């Protein structure tokens, strides 16, 4: 909201207004704000949870000192969700499709986890929400994200293609690129041009392989119209698998003091850096990685994510004063999965 407020006031020459246009400045503010919210608002939430006796039920796994944690407040993931949401609303570009998807993911997965914790704590049902329903709702989220990536015109990549020219100056487009705009930005001007074209793509970035890219259309056994449908079906299916796996994987990781929050913060730092690089034309070209317009906002969101987790770690590290519960772990995993897919 602050970002959009400064956009509305750009004609009034307010001192320091230009700083809000820098991703790095907004990322710093988002991180610090989320951390402070986790630290100070989190303390009040923990006291409220203790007062209401919203404690964790501990299963006896034979681990040393584990029964001492019985009664420790749970549902602390509310602290993380609150810090991320407020910081994101203040400093992110809310018109950006990537920001919208990540906010939706946070609320969706947080809602699943909150419902699960609520059933466990207030309904005194140790099983919580049934595994079937949790899985179904995660799969639904995967399809929503996948179909948005497939059909939303704002989610594109800039690909380099090679355009051959004959001696008489006639331009020949590569096979499958008959709709390429020949007036696209020319990168190298010689007998064979390297040009850039903004397109919908099923490519993803993979480290440690030549060219760093893998295209899911390579898995399609068909060509032409059926090939187009098949490659997107495979791509959406992979998105569903990644989101479901990340969400449940983080949920399983949340078994020791500070483990899920600490490791997720490290993952968030890496994703934030990669998102910033992918969203910057100069840096992505220099590092030979895919340029994805608009993903810089993911870096701002992940900064809020990191700040919220670091603030929460103050209370969650050993000896833990609060547990995040499924409210936090499912949301954290969903955020990691979706943000990794988008870059």
Give residue ranges: language-model regions.
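Glycine-/proline-rich flexible loop or hinge segments
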Residues: 26-33, 62-71
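Cytosolic, membrane-interface loops and tails of multi-pass inner-membrane proteins
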Residues: 45-68, 118-127, 190, 199-212
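Short, Lys/Arg-rich N-terminal segment immediately upstream of the first membrane anchor
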Residues: 17-22, 69-70, 125-129, 226
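A short, charged helix-loop
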Residues: 210-220
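Cytosolic juxtamembrane regulatory segments of multi-pass membrane proteins
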Residues: 65-72, 138-144
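Alpha-helical transmembrane segments
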Residues: 2-46, 80-111, 118, 132, ...
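ATP-dependent carbohydrate kinase catalytic cores
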Residues: 62, 67, 226, 230, ...
